[in-house]
């Protein structure tokens, strides 16, 4: 169990050649993200995330803006910091989740390997829903726009959304080792008692039969 799907929406900014020469607001575009994943224990999980939209690149001196459509997909390792460092509490409402992963990106005839990372703050609304805010960054091939300037191109985004957990969310707390040891000791005592009873020689009882004769009368 502990499978989930999430949908986030926000904005991203593209960092490539000549981006610093343009107004920052002109680098910002809409950023949708969808993901499916699974938590394997209270503090780590994996997700497959995909998204797309448009990027705004620029020519020399930001003379022209390039409107480019793209898609990406990545797989992330996720780690819940509070659940990791604190005792697991199924009723905990808030957690901070850094993530890191790899993936791929495509734009027209250009493809690139990507390195992906960021941090998520999530709040438990109910057993099925979390609200989250997520900041993420991505590094990819310099050839996605123009070669030169930065050694790699990058994308940074800020999104907000919701996560839906399928039935069966949560984990059972394992008993403490002292309790396990105590139960094992009690079972050993019972096993020894059973063995002693099985090895005990049978008790032989001598039964004397008493014969009662009628009294003869003369």
Functional labels for PLM-detected ranges:
Residues 180, 187, 194, 201-204, ...:
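Heptad-repeat positions
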Residues 14-20, 57-61, 86, 107-111, ...:
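Outer-membrane beta-barrel proteins
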Residues 1-2, 43, 83-95, 125-128, ...:
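Short loop/turn motifs that connect adjacent beta-strands in outer-membrane beta-barrel proteins
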Residues 1-37:
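Short glycine/proline- and aromatic-enriched beta-strand/turn motifs that initiate or cap beta-hairpins
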Residues 4-6, 45-47, 95-99, 130-132, ...:
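Residue-level detector of the transmembrane beta-barrel scaffold of outer-membrane proteins
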Residues 59-63, 126-199:
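Predominantly the C-terminal beta-signal and adjacent terminal strand-loop region
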Residues 42-115:
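Gram-negative (and chloroplast) outer-membrane scaffold detector with strong preference
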Residues 7-11, 34-38, 75-81, 100-104, ...:
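Residues on the lipid-exposed face of transmembrane beta-strands in outer-membrane beta-barrel proteins
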């Amino acid at each position: 169990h502990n499978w989930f799907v999430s949908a986030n929406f926000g904005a991203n900014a593209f960092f490539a050649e000549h981006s610093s020469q343009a107004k920052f607001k002109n680098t910002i575009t809409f950023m949708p993200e969808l993901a499916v994943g699974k938590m394997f224990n209270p503090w780590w999980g994996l997700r497959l995330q995909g998204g797309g939209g448009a990027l705004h690149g620029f020519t020399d001196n930001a003379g022209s803006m390039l409107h480019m459509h793209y898609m990406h997909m990545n797989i992330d390792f996720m780690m819940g910091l509070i659940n990791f460092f604190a005792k697991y509490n199924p009723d905990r409402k808030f957690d901070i989740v850094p993530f890191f992963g790899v993936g791929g990106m495509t734009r027209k005839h250009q493809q690139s390997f990507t390195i992906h990372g960021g941090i998520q703050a999530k709040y438990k609304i109910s057993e099925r829903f979390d609200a989250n805010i997520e900041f993420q960054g991505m590094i990819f091939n310099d050839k996605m726009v123009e070669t030169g300037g930065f050694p790699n191109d990058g994308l940074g985004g800020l999104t907000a959304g919701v996560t839906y957990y399928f039935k069966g969310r949560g984990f059972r707390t394992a008993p403490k080792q002292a309790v396990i040891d105590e139960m094992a000791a009690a079972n050993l005592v019972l096993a020894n008692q059973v063995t002693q009873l099985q090895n005990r020689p049978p008790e032989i009882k001598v039964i004397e039969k008493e014969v009662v004769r009628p009294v003869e009368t003369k």
